Amino acid sequence: MQNKRDSYTREDLLASSQGELWPQGPQLPAPNMLMMDRITKMSETEGDFGKGLILAELDITPDLWFFDCHFPGDPVMPGCLGLDAMWQLVGFFLGWVGGKGKGRALGVGEVKFTGQILPTAKKVTYEIHMKRVVNRKLVMGLADGRVCVDGKEIYVAKDLKVGLFQDTSSF
């Protein structure tokens, strides 16, 4: 597959948001909703289940858009953005393995938040362990994920589900 590498820069991720990385595959969202600065590792055979591993990072600076509005005087990154980042990465993996279609989050089995991301943090790390990839008429990924801030685990998600669809008009 063209553009299949084991790591991606921010410029690559921005190209994905414009449909330029794999034109028939899923796109990442554009900023401000793009929730990572780089993907540092992609593997089809590693991870907790031997079905794929994705490692990605987001650099934290106090001027990130969400700190101004969530919450004024008590800034914290919304937990849903970390969850969305994990779905973004599962969708990216589906495109990386050749899946075609538009990516949509389909659900999550369980999410636990045990910490927070403050403007004083330096780096968020995302870790996605693929459990299953279905690449037939239905294209779907199932994964577990973790979000860490400055090395400390703060979110855990089980059974993240993302599907790829040729037509989303009736979704």
Curated annotation (Swiss-Prot):
Q: Which reaction does it catalyse?
A: a (3R)-hydroxyacyl-[ACP] = a (2E)-enoyl-[ACP] + H2O; (3R)-hydroxydecanoyl-[ACP] = (2E)-decenoyl-[ACP] + H2O; (2E)-decenoyl-[ACP] = (3Z)-decenoyl-[ACP]
Pathway membership, UniProt? Lipid metabolism; fatty acid biosynthesis
Keywords, ordered alphabetically:
Cytoplasm, Fatty acid biosynthesis, Fatty acid metabolism, Isomerase, Lipid biosynthesis, Lipid metabolism, Lyase
Molecular-function annotations in GO: (3R)-hydroxyacyl-[acyl-carrier-protein] dehydratase activity; trans-2-decenoyl-acyl-carrier-protein isomerase activity
Q: Which GO terms describe its cellular component?
A: cytoplasm
Where found in the cell? Cytoplasm
A Gene Ontology biological process noted in the UniProt record is: unsaturated fatty acid biosynthetic process
Task: Report the EC number(s), separated by commas if there are several.
Answer: 4.2.1.59, 5.3.3.14
- Assembly description: Homodimer.
Q: Record's family?
A: Belongs to the thioester dehydratase family. FabA subfamily.
The protein here is known as: 3-hydroxydecanoyl-[acyl-carrier-protein] dehydratase
Q: Which gene encodes it?
A: fabA
